[in-house]
Every structure is written in structure tokens, then in C-alpha cells.
Amino acid sequence: MIRFGPSGNSKSFYDQGYSSSVQMPAWLKNMGLNAYEYQCSKGVNIGKSKAIEIGEQAKEHDIYMSIHAPYYINLISEDPEKKEKSIQYILQSMEAAVWMYAERVVVHVGSCTGIDRKEALKIAISSMKETIARADDLGLGNISICPETLGKINQFGTLDEILELCLIDERMIPTIDFGHLYARSGGKVNSVDEFAAVLERIEEVLGYERLKKIHAHFSRIEFTSG
């Protein structure tokens, strides 16, 4: 089943007098939508009781939940402290996902600035394997980590980089941000054939079953050569 919904709370939600994310599932249901990506982009600051309340509302209104982990994650950092914090941010997001009855956590992998891209991939794979192992130890293995394609050239997040990363564990699901692919390609991923080529590439690398499960973002975007 294909589901549609917003990432975060829209301006129209607040314009209509609503104020709490707990109200989002009912509002989305009324809008004819059936998915909600809760934003932890600035940190995992939600408490357990509120997360459970959102999750209960989502179950009641048949809203499929996911969480976006903090934007400042960098699993490619060569600084051990920064890498450890990044892993912790993902684990915290996964714990919040359990509370919220979410099954997916969307993750920005990090920056490749100053690092050879092949080396960056090796570091990302190592860091992600460690993250998954620790998640399993914490009983969080039922939550899928969903690394996202990113739009800036110096970020880890080409389509092939994300697919390669997802090969390390079948529970991983790629997040395909078509706006980011459009920006990264200089405006080339913007037609039916180009969208189809992306989906065909996912199936080629990860297989049809995971293609059916992909997480996708669509949004307007402006871009520069960087």
C-alpha cells in the first residue's frame, strides 16, 4: 500500500488553530492522508508519554508513522566523539520510534568534505554496522534505518552510495528524496523516464521486495552548483 503524508507539521495545520503534534493524526485523516514523518531534525526532545500519545492517535486514525533523525548526524566523521554522538542520535530516534509505533527512522549519513568518496563509503558502512549491532543489543532491531539521498555534492548521499549502504542489512530501506536527486544532478532527475530509472536502479541493487518498501520525499527545491 502506498501512503502519503507530510514530514513535520504544515503551516496550514497551525493556521487552522491546531498546536500539538498529538492532533496531527486526526487532522491528516481528515485531509485524506495516511502517513506522518515526525521531525526530530533538531534533536530527539520528545518525551515517552507524548510519543506514545502520538502513536496511539496514529493507530486510531490509520496513520503510518516514521521519524526523521537529527540533521546534524555525521557517521563519516573522523572525530570519535562526533561519530559516537551521531550513533547515539540514531539510537535515540529509534527508541522514540518504538514509543510512537513507528517502523522507520530516516537518517542523513553525513559529509564527505575532505574525504575520498570511496573511503567515506567504507567509514559509513563501518559506522552503520556498529549502529545496527548496538540497536539490536538494545532491542531496537525491528526499526528500519532509512539512509537518505542528499542534494549537496559534498554530502554522502548519491543514489548508488545509499543503495550500497543498504546492502549491509536487509532491514535497511533507502529514503529517496527526489528533490535532492534533482538538485544533485543539476536538474536532470525531473521526468517520468528519469524517475523510472531511479526505481529500476533500486530494484537492480536491492531487489523488488525492498523497492516496494522505499521511503520517498518530494518537495520543491532550489539549488546551486555546490
Predicted regions and their residues:
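A general structural motif
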Residues: 1, 33, 60-64, 102, ...
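Active-site acidic/histidine proton-transfer and metal-coordination neighborhood
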Residues: 76-175
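Hydrophobic faces of well-ordered beta-strands that scaffold small-molecule active sites
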Residues: 2-9, 36-38, 65-69, 105-107, ...
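Acidic/histidine-rich catalytic cores of soluble enzymes
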Residues: 131-226
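Well-ordered, non-membrane alpha-helical segments in soluble/globular domains
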Residues: 21-22, 90, 124-129, 192-201
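Alpha-helix-loop-beta-strand connector modules within alpha/beta enzyme cores
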Residues: 52-72, 125-136, 168-170, 200-201
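N-terminal pre-domain/capping segments
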Residues: 1-94
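Active-site-proximal loop/turn and secondary-structure-junction residues that shape catalytic pockets
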Residues: 10-12, 40-44, 69-73, 109-113, ...
